[in-house]
Amino acid sequence: MSINELESEQKDWALSMLCRSGVLSPCRHHEGVYVDEGIDIESAYKYSMKVYKSNEDKSPFCNVREMTDTVQNYYHEYGGNDTCPLCTKHIDD
């Protein structure tokens, strides 16, 4: 697996954990845009840890620290929007 493929798999995994834990939700109209649901990121860490431990051999991460750092990084990159900025822009226009 190439570095780019590994990074993509880690990103997909982290965003999946953030969404499945309820911390982020994808915009129904804009692919790749997420809405922050106002739930503490600790929920995502707990959920991610549970999934990681149950499937450690299938995880795209070398260790727990790498996994939690990746979840945190993508939360900071995609979180923080109360609403989809693209949907809001269309309403304002």
Curated annotation (Swiss-Prot):
InterPro entries: ea8_5-like, ea8_5-like_sf. It comes from the Viruses. Pfam families: Lambda_ea8_5. This is Protein ea8.5. The gene is ea8.5.
